[in-house]
Amino acid sequence: MGLVWSLISNSIQTIIADFAISVIDAALFFLMLLALAVVTVFLFWLIVAIGRSLVARCSRGARYRPV
């Protein structure tokens, strides 16, 4: 009976460990997607800010330049 109970206990522990690993894996995947989204938004904001400053600088230069 001890051997059977040991096998059952081992299988239960394996199932629980696999489930925990799956949950942790899913959480890490979600966090990775979240970090990727944040980095993408930050890069988009940075590119837009640089573009706006360049456009403002060019238009300011054209305003003071006589044609």
From Swiss-Prot:
Q: Which GO terms describe its biological process?
A: monoatomic ion transmembrane transport
- Cellular component annotations (GO), alphabetically ordered: extracellular region; host cell endoplasmic reticulum membrane; host cell Golgi membrane; membrane; viral envelope; virion membrane
Assembly notes: Homomultimer. Associates with itself into higher-order structures, including dimers, trimers and tetramers. Associates with the GP2b-GP3-GP4 complex.
Keywords (alphabetical) are: Glycoprotein, Host endoplasmic reticulum, Host Golgi apparatus, Host membrane, Ion channel, Ion transport, Lipoprotein, Membrane, Myristate, Secreted, Transmembrane, Transmembrane helix, Transport, Viral envelope protein, Viral ion channel, Virion
Q: What is this protein called?
A: Envelope small membrane protein
State the organism named in the record. Answer: Equine arteritis virus (strain Bucyrus) (EAV)
Gene Ontology molecular functions: channel activity
Topological domain ranges for the Virion surface compartment: 2-27
The similarity comment for this entry is: Belongs to the arteriviridae E protein family.
Location of the protein in the cell:
Virion membrane; Host endoplasmic reticulum membrane; Host Golgi apparatus membrane; Secreted
Explain the purpose of this protein. Answer: Minor envelope protein. May function as a viroporin in the virion envelope that facilitates uncoating of the virus in order to release the genomic RNA into the cytoplasm for subsequent replication.
Q: Which residues lie on this side of the membrane: Intravirion?
A: 49-67
Annotated transmembrane regions: 28-48
What topology in the membrane does the UniProt record assign? Single-pass type I membrane protein
N-myristoyl glycine: lipidated positions: G2
Q: Identify the stretch(es) annotated as Endoplasmic reticulum retention signal.
A: 2-15
How does it get modified after it is made? Myristoylated. Not glycosylated.
